[in-house]
């Protein structure tokens, strides 16, 4: 949402926002005559390769933010997290192999070193050079982390052959408008409220 709005507001590039459902600010951007010519929304399921046929063939940059995220969904649907997140990564790379770009930013997660900090007492804040690991493989929590580790490796090690500059961002519990309560920060707030007798 914020990246789309930021880039459209610059008015020096055209932005294609591709997702399985409409972003909360897309209709407002599309209705604004001063912004709409810089913006193209594409709604489809990008775990299906056929969805990529709706995209233009020339882009300078890709911001790969699409994924199943959130504690609740990861615990409830671990197999779907693996399927969707892995398929999205591979489909983007297959598309880039035929439609070159200059840069790809992959949205990863600090969850990638959560087990390292837990099991090996690593420092917090944690160095990005620390080895990554997961905890107990039977716990669904780690399905999300493993898809993000896979994504990092896939985008980093495909970069030379596909001639793009990769950037990996390991977010730590970001939150913003309209994200709902299925994420870490709302969970912490809810737990605090319950422990202190607040509604």
Named regions from a protein language model:
Residues 1-174:
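N-terminal Rossmann-like NAD(P)+-binding domain of SDR-like oxidoreductases, especially those catalyzing
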Residues 149, 162-167, 174-187, 194-199:
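Glycine/proline-rich active-site loop of Rossmann-fold NAD(P)-dependent oxidoreductases
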